[in-house]
Amino acid sequence: MWRVKVLINTQAKLFILGIIWDLDNDVLKCCTNFDSLTCEVKITKRLVLSTVQKVFDPIGMLAPSTLLPKLLLQEIWKMKRAWDQELPQNIVNKFMKWFNEIQILKGISVPRCMKIDIFTELHVFVDASKGSYAGCVFARSIVDSRVSVILVRAKSRVAPLKLLSIPRLELMACCVGARLVNSILKALNMPDLKVTLWSDSTTTLWWIKEYGNWSVFVANRVKEIRQLTQIQSWKYVPGNMNIADLLSRGCSPRQMLSSRWWEGPSWLKQNS
């Protein structure tokens, strides 16, 4: 214990599993400081992949902006380019735009410690687009007589190369959300917290809440969702009020700065 105290008192920042812990402000940050790329550097599939992997973000605080290069990578894979073959200029332009902007997110942080009690609510938002599907979890608490909403965790996944319908991708997003909130409840050891899961897909909500002769694809995922969550906890949210829309479509780092991503939707802060 003595050694730990000495370390905390002598360093302003620590690295915890690749995440920066700012001790002065007790917040967590992601490292986005990369070596600069000059115009002489050849942009290849290997370089894009290695750069994307350098953003270690297990919480998902930067997930909307880190989705863009992942979608770009899938586009590169479809081209069947060699690892060290120079990429087309339109791909290079997209990558460099993201690379130059990602640096502005180095100051983004989330509180390390969240005040969780028996009155805390977990709100899960899920969504999908043609290129990806995603889920995110926000904790809603009353702190000093004020409503506090904070991002707990988020995850986005690139859609499979095999073409799937939007409703099926939305169902996969529901699986992501169910797994996320289930892991959070286990980590907190508070299984009785109120959980609400929000989707803007009426089709997937129908699959989850009703019983029918679904296809194997739908049936397997509905079964998992029902095992991890309560059916009555799933609710509809209009698309323009679904914060996961930002996560499933992705956005540039600059757009992300002006969004409500870390605060959650404004309506969630209204008194019940």
Kindly label every feature range from the protein language model.
Residues 1, 176-234, 238-243:
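RNase H catalytic domain
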Residues 65, 72-75, 131-134, 142-145, ...:
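Flexible loop/turn segments at secondary-structure boundaries
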Residues 6, 11-116, 121:
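C-terminal reverse transcriptase regions that engage the nucleic-acid substrate
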Residues 142-172, 176:
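A short, polar/acidic, helix/strand-boundary loop motif
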Residues 18, 52, 56, 60, ...:
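Mobile genetic element proteins and their domesticated derivatives, centered on retroelements
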Residues 13-14, 27, 54, 61-62, ...:
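Beta-sheet entry/capping signal
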